């Protein structure tokens, strides 16, 4: 049980299913392994510092949990590391037949792919924005064993009139209402950078990104662009957006934000303030 849990990153329920024992029995086995010395923990000095930073962030921004991961050894691995950590955090806290809200972006895509290998029980996923079908675990959906409720709309409509009409559609508004039923909400935090998913995917142009930055935008959540205090920036993009409103996101329980990198520091700080 200890090997599966600590080295193969399996959840307690997955271990119970693999060994044909109860989850409570797995918990007792893991506890016995720790007390007997089979499993020993050593905290690196940098890990102690990260734990202290986590506590400080929790106190400052009134957060339930904060997990800071070590810096990735190789360039380009940071999003993958954040995604894996986010998936492990959620997997260990999901109940049977759980429901998860999912946001938009590259980190969310990676997180869902990792979650697909960690969760054995059926999971319901609800999209918080339009235009999400391309990054859900398409090829691994059988492994993920998920029931998907996707917002049947693009992320950005061609006009604010079209966006208003789409938001009024029952098939879209019902998905937005369903979000309140979820156990967890996973969202990415986007930076105002040319490599942001929303720019690379062609949703907005470089010129639109520049105008948003000139208007005071420092980042986005669910493609809602916010200023340094986490307040919404009015824009043509916002008028054409098909996405769960920020006020509804703030009202949800267990919202998990996933973000990493120096270029996202300002955006992360703004979202925490908002």
Model-derived segments and spans:
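Conserved phosphate- and dinucleotide-binding cores of soluble alpha/beta proteins
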Residues: 2, 7-14, 20, 25-31, ...
């Amino acid at each position: 049980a200890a090997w599966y849990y600590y080295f193969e990153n399996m959840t307690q329920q997955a271990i119970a299913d693999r060994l044909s024992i109860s989850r409570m029995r797995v918990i007792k086995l893991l506890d016995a392994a720790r007390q007997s010395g089979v499993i020993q923990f050593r905290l690196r000095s940098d890990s102690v510092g990260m734990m202290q930073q986590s506590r400080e962030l929790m106190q400052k921004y009134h957060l339930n949990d904060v997990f800071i991961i070590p810096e990735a050894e190789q360039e380009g691995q940071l999003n993958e590391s954040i995604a894996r950590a986010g998936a492990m955090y959620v997997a260990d806290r999901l109940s049977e037949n759980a429901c998860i809200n999912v946001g938009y972006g590259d980190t969310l895509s990676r997180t869902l792919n990792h979650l697909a290998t960690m969760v054995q029980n059926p999971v319901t996923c609800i999209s918080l924005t339009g235009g999400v079908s391309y990054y859900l675990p398409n090829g691994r959906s059988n492994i993920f064993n998920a029931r998907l409720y996707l917002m049947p709309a693009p992320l950005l409509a061609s006009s604010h009139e079209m966006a208003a009409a789409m938001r009024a559609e029952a098939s879209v508004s019902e998905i937005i209402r369903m979000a309140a039923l979820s156990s967890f909400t996973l969202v990415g935090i986007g930076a105002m950078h040319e490599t942001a998913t929303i720019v690379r995917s062609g949703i907005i142009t470089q010129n639109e990104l520049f105008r948003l930055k000139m208007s005071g935008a420092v980042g986005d959540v669910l493609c809602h662009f916010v200023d340094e205090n986490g307040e919404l920036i009015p824009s043509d993009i916002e008028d054409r957006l098909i996405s769960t409103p920020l006020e509804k996101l703030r009202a949800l329980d267990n919202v998990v934000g996933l973000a990493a990198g120096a270029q996202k520091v300002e955006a992360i700080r703004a979202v925490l303030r908002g």
